[in-house]
Amino acid sequence: LFTDYTFGLWTNAEEPQLVTFAKAYSGLNDAEILELDRWIRRNTLQRFGPARSLKTELVFEIGFEGIHPSKRHKSGIAVRFPRILRWRRDKPADEADSLQTAMALIENR
C-alpha cells in the first residue's frame, strides 16, 4: 500500500517541468488512500526500488507550517510539516501551482 507521497511544483521555463518540493503522508482518508494506491499501480511509468515515477495527472492541495529557502533541495525551498489538505479532482495537472508562487510565499512572509 503506497502511503508516502512526493509532490512537485511546475517550473516557469518555456517547457514547464515538475520539481519536487514536499513529501507528505497524512491528510487522506482510508478510502482515498486505497483509491490513490490503485491509481499509482495503474499509472506507474518507471520504478526506482520502492519509488515510482507516475503520469502527471493528479493535483493535491498541500498545507505546511512554514516555508524557507533551501540549498539542499532542488526546488530551492523547504517546507515544514507538509500535509495533504485535499485531493483537487476539479483541477487538471497543468493548473497545479508553480515554483514561482512558492518563492513568493517566502518573499512575502
Cite the ranges covered by each PLM segment:
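Classical nucleotidyltransferase
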Residues: 1-109
